[in-house]
Amino acid sequence: MSMSSSTSTIVAIASAAGIGGVGIVRLSGPQSVQIAAHLGIARMQPRHAHYARFRDGHGAVIDDGIALWFNAPHSFTGEDVVELQGHGSPVLLRQLVARCIELGARQARAGEFSERAFLNGKLDLAQAEAIADLIAAGDLRAARAARRALDGVFSQRVDALAETLTRLRIHVEAAIDFADEPLDTLGGNQVRDGLGQARNVLAQLLRDAERGRKLRDGLHAVLIGPPNAGKSSLLNALAGSDRAIVTDVAGTTRDTLHEAIQLDGFELTLVDTAGLRDGGDAIEREGMRRARAELERADLALVVLDARDLQAARDAIGDAIDTVPRQLWIHNKCDLLGNAASLDANAIAVSAVTGQGLEQLHIRLRALALGDGVDSVDGEFSARTRHVQALRRAEQHADAADLELGFEQLELAAEELRLAHEALGEITGKLSADDLLGKIFSSFCIGK
């Protein structure tokens, strides 16, 4: 998809779909004010509200409302922007858009207003993505994290780190010009120390971005275990509703069941699965295959065992969970144990029926979801998978640069620093291909 042209004027409905009290049509581009004049809004002044009747080509009134002009470059897109605020009737809003197109505008593509804001330097790529994340936020915590990303909290940290890597690269490339001199005499120790500090900063930024990604996307947690361990009962207890069928018959669950729950503003998707065991009929075996497939994309495995027979339960699971990096072992049905029974100290003892241990389970889930410091949200920002991937590449190149410096391979070290800087530039859009930009903005809402 090609990037937006600043010579055209675009139009779209900017308010939410459906019927509402107020509807907004947004224009952006060089003809915005001229089109507004043809609609019947004459002598507009920037940043003043003008009451007007919006008319069609025959002079008939389409609607009446308020018109606002945000003159370039003092607007969201950096261009002349006119917003027409009328009644929230989809029929009237579509008619108003059609009239603007008759007057020379064209229908905006999804995300094209934000794309123009990016191209005109009003915000960087991470901030533009934060707009979509703010709109789609499912809870207050995610919304606040997206707001911080939109305010530039994430971008500023990325830019500061990129600047540090640039300075280090300048020192390394300067040393290349004096190849006959030992690196230490050219400030090599300071470069290594500086790179070490930059790697620490990068590692922390990566951890924070991963946490921000979880805030945006939520966590995929798979309930896994042998039949009749109480996985479905536990899902119902955590969800607060009878989402899964529960019986005393082993193998009741044959398919996967997804249920999203909120943990203090964090979304956790629980996946109930078929119990793992040897044998079973064809349908049950297919259910077990799907359970293992869910584990392959799980962020967290909730291993549910019957506390009355832990060894047999562990044997039934086998190596199914080995591929999941994070696991939480849950000993269910603890209410059926005698007082003398002892459980693994690293596991959580719960009863899905009585509710015993569920509060502790919630606490552990929060900690696993967001890591250390889950109660400190002041610095949280939203992030996306591509941001995390870019930071990981930057970390790999920074580590490689440190290794090459140790061998005094200055040309290779300089190249690794360049690649680390390039990976960071992809986050903010300073170094992004047009096809990547097009893919990102096409996922936005129309009118944004």
Curated annotation (Swiss-Prot):
Coiled coil: none annotated. Keywords: Cytoplasm, GTP-binding, Hydrolase, Magnesium, Metal-binding, Nucleotide-binding, Potassium, tRNA processing. Pfam families: MMR_HSR1, MnmE_helical, TrmE_N. InterPro entries: G_TrmE, GTP-bd, GTP-bd_TrmE_N, GTPase_MnmE, MnmE_dom2, MnmE_helical, P-loop_NTPase, Small_GTP-bd. GTP binds at residues 228-233, 247-253, 272-275. Signal peptide: none annotated. Its cofactor is K(+). The keyword Cell membrane does not apply. SUPFAM superfamilies: P-loop containing nucleoside triphosphate hydrolases (SSF52540). Disulfide bonds: none annotated. Mg(2+) binds at residues 232, 253. Residues 218-370 form the TrmE-type G domain. Binds 1 potassium ion per subunit. Its EC number is 3.6.-.-. (6S)-5-formyl-5,6,7,8-tetrahydrofolate binds at residues 26, 83, 122, 448. It is found in: Cytoplasm. NCBIfam families: mnmE_trmE_thdF, PRK05291.1-3, small_GTP. Homodimer. Heterotetramer of two MnmE and two MnmG subunits. Belongs to the TRAFAC class TrmE-Era-EngA-EngB-Septin-like GTPase superfamily. TrmE GTPase family. This is tRNA modification GTPase MnmE. The gene is mnmE.
